[in-house]
């Protein structure tokens, strides 16, 4: 990755870029290796990365670009402010948690409602109830990727009972397949299944 990143940085430098940053989806260790390119390319200021799914920051210095990663499912973001002046470029960043304390922008809500309506036109059963959870089912990433969870157990039970002839004795599923990263409570809907198997 480092060699390819340096080729791209050199191209941006040749094009006269005022600032260069990386947008990646790599392991933190790989991002840190790429960040060291700042030593030879001082216009390379920061990397915004993904992959780990947890908020992370590796602070840079004169020879290393900053590396910032937000949480999965847009639960945390980094606000990055860049100031250009005759004296150079200044970059500052702030971690922002996206939670109930932030009001939903009405203009955004109109757009979200429009697209949800289009989804329901294409898949009218998406909001349909397929079951009921008397106990909240834990589909959070921290649970399904680190041990047994009742949501993972529920999914595996559905898989096992789907095979009747011959009957399956057991079923298991890789926790990384379960992408909902949330609790499922009360009505279980097709939407919950769609959010769980986001890549299907």
Predicted features along the sequence, with ranges:
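Short acidic, glycine-rich surface-loop motifs adjacent to enzyme active sites
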Residues: 5-31
């Amino acid at each position: 990755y480092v060699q390819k990143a340096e080729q791209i940085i050199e191209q941006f430098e040749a094009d006269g870029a005022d600032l260069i940053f990386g947008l990646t989806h790599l392991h933190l260790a790989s991002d840190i290796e790429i960040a060291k390119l700042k030593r030879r390319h001082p216009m390379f200021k920061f990397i915004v990365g993904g992959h780990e799914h947890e908020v992370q920051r590796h602070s840079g210095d004169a020879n290393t670009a900053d590396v910032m990663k937000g949480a999965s499912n847009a639960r945390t973001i980094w606000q990055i402010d860049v100031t250009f002046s005759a004296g150079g470029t200044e970059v500052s960043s702030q971690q922002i948690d996206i939670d109930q304390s932030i009001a939903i922008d009405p203009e955004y809500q109109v757009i979200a409602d429009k697209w949800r309506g289009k989804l329901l036109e294409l898949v009218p059963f998406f909001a349909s109830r397929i079951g009921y959870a008397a106990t909240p089912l834990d589909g959070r990433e921290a649970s399904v990727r680190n041990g047994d969870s009742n949501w993972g157990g529920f999914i595996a039970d559905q898989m096992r009972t789907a095979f009747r002839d011959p009957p399956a004795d057991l079923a298991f599923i890789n926790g990384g397949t379960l992408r909902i990263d949330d609790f499922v409570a009360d009505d279980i809907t097709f939407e919950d299944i769609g959010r769980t198997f986001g890549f299907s």
